[in-house]
Regions:
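Acidic, metal-coordinating catalytic segment for phosphate/diphosphate chemistry
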Residues: 1-27
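A short catalytic or substrate-binding loop motif that flags glycine-/basic-rich loops and adjacent residues
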Residues: 20-22, 31, 94
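Conserved beta-strand and immediately adjacent loop positions that scaffold enzyme active sites
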Residues: 27, 36, 119
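Anionic group-transfer/hydrolysis microenvironments
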Residues: 29, 43, 126
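Conserved hydrophobic "DFG−1" position in protein kinase catalytic cores
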Residues: 30-31, 39, 104, 122
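Conserved Nudix-box catalytic region and its N-terminal flanking loop in Nudix hydrolases
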Residues: 32, 36-73
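Unchanged
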Residues: 57-80, 86-144, 149-153
């Protein structure tokens, strides 16, 4: 079944490249009370990389609602204290994407369905996995240093 998910992801990205699709997405940097950060590893695409939870914004959905929904769908966690960080342009995956990034808080352990998400967990900022994506590392560094967010993902 994951094979079909991977094929679908490849086909979707091909269509994005051909049609130059514009999309909107939302991601969240979700922290525990101890300051640990939630990271996920998808079961499609770059399956070896840890990234922030997130996904597309629905037609009648706010970016905040989309970020909370994506965290809930991908990890089973309910977020609180959702705060806007910034918007980023992203032309990865062949599309022209605007990513809305938020910080949030959550308690509990992530529960994944093991279909879309291969792995999820909270990590101390000084003990992140080696396989964190470059864009995710940049967002973490900006957050930790208090720097203004870059305009590109």
């Amino acid at each position: 079944m994951r094979f079909l998910l991977q094929i679908g992801w490849i086909a979707r990205n091909f269509v994005y490249r051909v049609l130059k699709v514009r999309t909107r997405g939302a991601k969240a940097m979700v922290f525990t009370g101890k300051g640990e950060l939630l990271l996920i590893r998808n079961s499609y695409g770059a399956t070896h990389l840890f990234v922030l939870p997130g996904g597309g914004i629905g037609r009648r959905e706010t970016p905040e609602d989309a970020a909370a929904r994506e965290v809930r769908e991908e990890t089973g966690l309910e977020v609180r204290e959702l705060r806007f960080v910034g918007c980023f342009a992203n032309d990865g995956e062949g599309k022209r994407d605007t990513i809305h990034l938020f910080t949030a808080r959550a308690d509990g352990e992530p529960k994944i369905d093991a279909f879309e998400i291969a792995e999820a967990g909270f990590f101390a900022l000084d003990a992140l996995p080696d396989s964190v994506s470059g864009a995710t590392r940049r967002r973490i560094a900006e957050y930790c240093s208090g720097a203004e967010p870059a305009g590109r993902w």
